[in-house]
A protein has these predicted regions:
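Beta-lactam-recognizing serine transpeptidase/beta-lactamase-like catalytic domain environment
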Residues: 1-12, 18-238, 266
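Amphipathic alpha-helical segments in well-structured domains
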Residues: 88, 249-250
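Short, gly/Ser/Thr-rich active-site loops of penicillin-recognizing serine hydrolases
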Residues: 158, 250-271
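A short acidic/glycine-rich loop-to-helix N-cap element
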Residues: 238-248
């Protein structure tokens, strides 16, 4: 089941999950691979990619899994670069193979493409995607790799992709999403009532020269993590900082999870 409004296409920090799965599928990256984020600042073709804690000195050397747990932009980019850096079109091809198809996407076929564009794409920029499209992808992960068309009422299920990635890598990304909630920055999404899994993100949707910047913060996940029944995406706009997908959208996600779980418990008691 899905609980979501269609919204509008936008940048999405939730892309980190998609990118990590694509990197794993390449066979060139493992969750145990180590990447050096240094002091949380990475310069690519003259453009600066930062992790959220760059002002505190960054994360240094961390694994791909640890990078996912702390929503590291640099780890995401370096994992994707290791997998597809020699041919960025292979990254786009992998996204298509996994049926991740944004409303708009800036690709290596476009004039002026650069390594910096590759980096921004890997973390959710240079594309416009509907929240419902992102939810559909996360739901496929919950569904052990089977992607289905979202339905809001009971009806026949339409399969989009029978298996978006190998079962081994689906298992890996499921584990990473669970750890994001239990051990990473997603702890505010942690429910005492049921096991959950998910990922969060933040994207700037206003121009750099605007005095007060606008952000979209997101959390997408599913529950129960060990036998999923529901997938949910929370997307919120926020003017100015602080703006955190893990804190703001993650808290709302947990409230929704607890509400549904309580209602199901009451329904079971009545029966």
């Amino acid at each position: 089941k899905a609980m979501v409004g269609e919204g509008k296409p936008q940048y999405s920090g939730l892309m980190r999950t998609v990118s990590l799965l694509a990197a794993l599928e390449s066979g060139k990256v493992a969750l145990t691979d180590t990447f050096d984020t240094k002091e949380g600042v990475c310069i690519i073709d003259g453009e600066i990619l930062k992790d959220h804690n760059w002002h505190r000195g960054g994360y240094g050397k961390i694994t791909a899994l640890q990078g996912f747990e702390v929503t590291s932009n640099i780890t995401t980019y370096k994992a994707v670069d290791k997998a597809f850096g020699e041919n960025a079109q292979e990254y786009i091809d992998m996204l298509n193979k996994m049926s991740y198809k944004p409303e708009e996407i800036y690709s290596p076929q476009e004039e002026g493409w650069s390594n910096a564009d590759f980096a921004w794409l890997s973390i959710g920029y240079n594309q416009l995607v509907y929240p419902l499209q992102m939810l559909t992808f996360y739901n496929a992960i919950a569904n052990n790799g089977k992607m289905v068309k979202p339905i809001f009422n009971k009806g026949e299920t339409e399969i989009i992709n029978q298996q978006i990635a190998s079962k081994a890598n689906i298992n890996n990304i499921q584990m990473a999403m669970e750890k994001f909630v239990t051990e990473g920055l997603g702890k505010l999404a942690l429910s005492e009532k049921v096991k959950v899994a998910g990922g969060s993100g933040r994207s700037q949707i206003s121009k750099d020269d605007e005095e007060i910047k606008e952000y979209v913060v997101m959390f997408c996940g599913y529950f129960p993590a060990d036998k999923p029944k529901y997938s949910i995406i929370v997307s919120m706009n926020k003017m100015g900082l602080p703006a955190s997908g893990s804190v703001m959208a993650g808290s709302v996600f947990r409230e929704i999870v607890d509400c549904i779980t309580e209602k199901e418990s009451l329904h079971a008691i009545k029966e």
